[in-house]
Amino acid sequence: MTHEQKNILSVRDMEREEIDKLLCSAAAFDRGNYTGRELEGKILAVLFFEPSTRTRMSFSAAMMRLGGKILNLGSVEATSITKGETLSDTIRVISGYCDAIVLRHPKEGAARLASEVASVPVINGGDGAGQHPSQTLLDLFTIRESMRIENIDVGLQGDLRYGRTVHSLAFALAKYNNVRLHTIAPDGLDFPRYIKEDLRDIGVELIAHDHIEQALPELDVLYVTRLQRERFPDPVAFANYASTYRITPELLECAKPGMIVLHPLPRVDEIDPAVDSLPCAKYFEQAHNGVPIRMAMLNEVIN
């Protein structure tokens, strides 16, 4: 890695000024303020070792909108990784084929490892239960379109233990003034202790709720995540939790006026489709915001 090389691995590494710069840049791209030649002649390697729809496609769309090209890993089974090649060796080789790498990997810390051996910038597209900075930046971008990111109450509901999107978002929101985090999670799926301790150490107010009804009147943002069926060995327990944590139009009648509902997608049963047509439902708009925010990220690290 060269000294000047810029990576985006975790929002915890970023200053608020860096985040705000990317959000402003994304807003300009979203308004159509670009030529389509910003990254002409540049190549982005898209290395995904886990399934993805939105992250993979929006990074690809972002690169192409700026005039660049995509080098896609394709199926992991068709690569030398199945022969035992290490991630480090794979990254070293692919660095010679491209101008930047976006990496998704099931192992936490994989993106940081890749950045240490790569000769081009690395963007973390999600690593295990760790960080997902591009998702967090588009989450912030979506919130900022509805309200100022300060003096707000944000509810985080669902799988907070293994969900990398909520881990990243919590630390990003901690960089803004007077943001209070409300957690609503099943037993055993709240934030890990080390994350709670780290958040409290940097002054974040964490408020735990047993039921979503307790939190809704206070929230400006409700961020819902998918409960993962594989975390529940008992299918009856999963069904009970899924129904308890399901967001419905009737439930939202007690929400604070102006509250917005976000979800990193894909959703399963946690949000009733009847919510989709309500003014508070911003999750499809949130997904669409992935393109301008990733345009901003690619332009920043490559140019």
Swiss-Prot record:
One Gene Ontology term of the molecular function aspect: aspartate carbamoyltransferase activity
Database matches in PANTHER family: ASPARTATE CARBAMOYLTRANSFERASE, ORNITHINE CARBAMOYLTRANSFERASE, MITOCHONDRIAL
Key word Ribosomal protein present: no
Main function: Catalyzes the condensation of carbamoyl phosphate and aspartate to form carbamoyl aspartate and inorganic phosphate, the committed step in the de novo pyrimidine nucleotide biosynthesis pathway.
Record protein name field: Aspartate carbamoyltransferase catalytic subunit
Family of the protein in this entry: Belongs to the aspartate/ornithine carbamoyltransferase superfamily. ATCase family.
NCBIfam families, alphabetized: asp_carb_tr, PRK00856.1
Cell inner membrane keyword on record: no
TM annotation in the entry: none
One GO term (biological process): amino acid metabolic process
Keywords of this entry: Pyrimidine biosynthesis, Transferase
